[in-house]
């Protein structure tokens, strides 16, 4: 994947001058939601969570020749009366392309009703689409137009709750055969509660053998952490991989490591990974994950979500 942002934005060559404009993140609400487009370097999928707690957060997926070329997580954050953008890129296995440290923030340069420019990055809004103009040094510019895909999401019957809500794989056991289409019901924009605060997830639908999602956790009107998540086809089955990030996108895991949850079993509207469960409910979506305790023990933590309404 070329070393350019997968963001719904474009690279510019000139740095910012003067003081950054004073604003909050609310004027960028139009970026929220799902976007898709094609360009010379392949297909770009993006899903942005709307403004909350002074931030926006997005997941990006690049597809080339029918295969995932890489993922990225991006945030736009209120800072010192203005905005900064941060971006971290990863390969198809969620191995990092940068260090574990938080990426250098890009200051806001200008903002209007139809355009936003950060240091080195620009996006132009044109009707119902976003135009990316990528000016890559020593290379030809790339232009990509992203539009909102039309999604028909069929009704998904709720799954039957099981006890215990989280299962763990038996030593030496194999994961069952499965394709990402089996968890297509995970796609969408979800908001709810978990870990004593607000939890939000946005999932891109299946493509090129993967789903990709972003998580934002908020407690006390402050972001506590983010996650970049994927569900991928691996060894004839599925695995959920994720990476955690501090509010400045400093990685909790080392760049080459992602937390992995192999599939244990799946049903039409539930997926039981090793230590993590997703299932559809009558109200939306429920997730359970085994979390560690300070005394070395563990306990299951519940997250419950409803579809975000426009």
Each language-model region and where it sits:
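N-terminal helix-cap/turn-to-beta initiation motif at the start of protein domains
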Residues: 20-34, 174-189
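Boundary at the C-terminal end of the N-terminal hydrophobic targeting segment
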Residues: 16-18
